[in-house]
Amino acid sequence: MDPDPQAGVQVGMRVVRGVDWKWGQQDGGEGGVGTVVELGRHGSPSTPDRTVVVQWDQGTRTNYRAGYQGAHDLLLYDNAQIGVRHPNIICDCCKKHGLRGMRWKCRVCLDYDLCTQCYMHNKHELAHAFDRYETAHSRPVTLSPRQGLPRIPLRGIFQGAKVVRGPDWEWGSQDGGEGKPGRVVDIRGWDVETGRSVASVTWADGTTNVYRVGHKGKVDLKCVGEAAGGFYYKDHLPRLGKPAELQRRVSADSQPFQHGDKVKCLLDTDVLREMQEGHGGWNPRMAEFIGQTGTVHRITDRGDVRVQFNHETRWTFHPGALTKHHSFWVGDVVRVIGDLDTVKRLQAGHGEWTDDMAPALGRVGKVVKVFGDGNLRVAVAGQRWTFSPSCLVAYRPEEDANLDVAERARENKSSLSVALDKLRAQKSDPEHPGRLVVEVALGNAARALDLLRRRPEQVDTKNQGRTALQVAAYLGQVELIRLLLQARAGVDLPDDEGNTALHYAALGNQPEATRVLLSAGCRADAINSTQSTALHVAVQRGFLEVVRALCERGCDVNLPDAHSDTPLHSAISAGTGASGIVEVLTEVPNIDVTATNSQGFTLLHHASLKGHALAVRKILARARQLVDAKKEDGFTALHLAALNNHREVAQILIREGRCDVNVRNRKLQSPLHLAVQQAHVGLVPLLVDAGCSVNAEDEEGDTALHVALQRHQLLPLVADGAGGDPGPLQLLSRLQASGLPGSAELTVGAAVACFLALEGADVSYTNHRGRSPLDLAAEGRVLKALQGCAQRFRERQAGGGAAPGPRQTLGTPNTVTNLHVGAAPGPEAAECLVCSELALLVLFSPCQHRTVCEECARRMKKCIRCQVVVSKKLRPDGSEVASAAPAPGPPRQLVEELQSRYRQMEERITCPICIDSHIRLVFQCGHGACAPCGSALSACPICRQPIRDRIQIFV
């Protein structure tokens, strides 16, 4: 049976003691709850494979068996913290939709489900047997009725618990200082990602914040006063480390629908209503879309079909309610593929090919007829041709968004140049109403002034669709602009396309004209017919000084255009040539770096997609919390950088953004999966060295090693690293240092696979189809190389050697160990990297690097190889090296006393009514208030004496 990837052990799961428990009161007693914070790995002496480290709510941190030696010390109480969710399932007791965590389904009653909390609180009939579903994809496990079974009370961090800062605390003095207690007021989920994974805590000073209790495997709190969290049936919880069996899944090839398919619902309303029960539900408005054509947006976890009918309307349908027709329908906008030879081949028997069709290649057209045999009549390039559906692709306007910007700019420039030429060539009557525009186009200030004096009412008359002020702004004629403004020209008057004079100044790259118009009070954020402001226009044209002038005068840098792109989105799309514009925009104080365009890309996503390193760095400096933000498909900035081979961007996200390198998208792919999938050889060592798990699996159960062996491109040779990507050369050098064939002998897939095996990837790991990397390495030479790399990794682990690359790991609190694995003999003397003396090197924890001698290690706070904070320094005999004494500082008692005095002083001068402003008015009784509060009072709020006089003070 295939294991369910979400049912495997993951950090963040909440656990209780299990059937093989033999560790006394480490959990605080039966019913104590803990969080899985670390997974065991091959070769580790304290946390070997199939073990976990648990942070108990009451503070102990210890490792336990999760299948190791056949024992299971723990039971899984809740997996909502890792994002487990059952879409379209409603708890029939508490009515929560999209049930989180394990699902409990009654075997007696029809379609009756409970969430974990309701099941454990004895909701529904106790004599009824239930099925347990660990995840949405796992097979049900039949359980005995709850009647007569013992229930164990839960204790730990629940609502009402008293807590202090815990092992993963990184929130400064939000709690009021070390050891200050707070009270848990709520347990909730983190946005839509996870459930019951954070606690809302109110501290002694009255402030309330949210802290992690399982979210991403972190625990910010320690329980000092337990609270009751309900009950659990020990016999009904799954053993941690024994994955649930996966339901038989239909392969993608046999799915009736795929993303992008055109579908219709042709059923009667009553039939559709019945079919929708349990498959997205029924809404009366769905009847309006019966018979209409929609597009398959996605397939849900349960196999239901999400259909989009227009820009705003999506419905979830039972797959049996939909009918799939031709790929394209009359009225669909399509693009003809651009490859001539391919089109000729595909057209055989489908309308055939003539040379007259060549202008249609790569062009966008519209389907005007669908023939019975599936061929399509398409209007394109002024003609109508019959095409095979294989020659067409669905046209998405967003694909050409950047092209549209450039095309519009060229069209604007071209049309303006033609208009100016026509104006200058005009030989109209001097008294013609549009003569003023001609004189401005010719730069004749004296004649323009004369016309303004004689005919001031003609100041806004148009010629060639433009006013004199618009032409002067485009040409940068500052003197004429001032004359026209003095004559009360319409500064915000638009042309036929909605462009104002400010737009024209931006189009003409005229920063001084821009400043003059802004000083005259023009609308800085006026939009044209494409929803673009002058700032959009200047950014799209790459005019740095105009952008600077607009930003200096307070233009709104957050307004979106027709594609929902802000000016910074457009600047990022322009590439490194617009770096100066990016710098100017990101320095604007009120810029919204969380802005999202119509494709769901935040600015950080967009910069990562385009590989704009400067923009990524600037955005992270403003809002580092966005580094792990996900799009609708689960992609983060690091996913996008990995997918598009932007190595520098990935480095910035990892080193400066401190992103989660093991984050998953909706297909459970990590950034390493994507880099390997796209054969981006240079990114693989970077991600692995940053701590990306080499054994993480996607929704198909494939690890990066499985994916690598499906890539067959020849490995690019990197002879000179000058100015190039050092990643491929780094990967090759590591392979060669291990005695493996070099670049001339391996394909990309084989080279990456060997590298991953050297870094600890499991060559025997089976995916959901039951295939391991060794099964995929069909070629004997590759199979032999892969086995050799795996053997080298095992030898290195057995010998206690360091990893071949500087693996970055986050430091963790000290862990008490229950389990010990025999270690190899201690290391011999080696050269210290600092003083170059031959000595026994000190082992740094947690990174496990040996780089310096004892004398040099004393003052080190970070490992010089991987820059990870050192929590322990161990001699070869296991004794700890004392760190150098810190410089003397003020006694802690003195610091706390001063802080207390400061708070008292602050309280004495703060208004007791609004508790916001300082006291500005003092009453005759000696008490006081701020001016707004004190003016409205008739009696003192403290002593209740009537107020006869108010004395204003200045603090």
UniProtKB/Swiss-Prot annotation:
Residues annotated to bind Zn(2+) 2: C106, C109, H124, H128
Quaternary structure (record): Interacts with actin monomer.
Gene3D superfamilies: 3.30.60.90, Ankyrin repeat-containing domain, SH3 Domains, Zinc/RING finger domain, C3HC4 (zinc finger)
Keywords from the UniProt entry: Acetylation, Actin-binding, ANK repeat, Cytoplasm, Endosome, Metal-binding, Notch signaling pathway, Phosphoprotein, Repeat, Transferase, Ubl conjugation, Ubl conjugation pathway, Zinc, Zinc-finger
Principal subcellular localisation of the protein: cytoplasm
Organism: Homo sapiens
PTMs per UniProt: Ubiquitinated. Possibly via autoubiquitination.
Role, per record: E3 ubiquitin-protein ligase that mediates ubiquitination of Delta receptors, which act as ligands of Notch proteins. Positively regulates the Delta-mediated Notch signaling by ubiquitinating the intracellular domain of Delta, leading to endocytosis of Delta receptors.
Pathway connected to this protein: Protein modification; protein ubiquitination
Binding site for Zn(2+) 1: C91, C94, C115, C118
Domain MIB/HERC2: 1-80, 149-227
Classification via InterPro entries: Ankyrin_rpt, Ankyrin_rpt-contain_sf, MIB1/2_ZZ, Mib_Herc2, Mib_Herc2_sf, SH3_15, Znf_RING, Znf_RING/FYVE/PHD
Protein name per Swiss-Prot or TrEMBL: E3 ubiquitin-protein ligase MIB2
Residue ranges covered by zinc fingers (RING-type): 832-867, 911-944
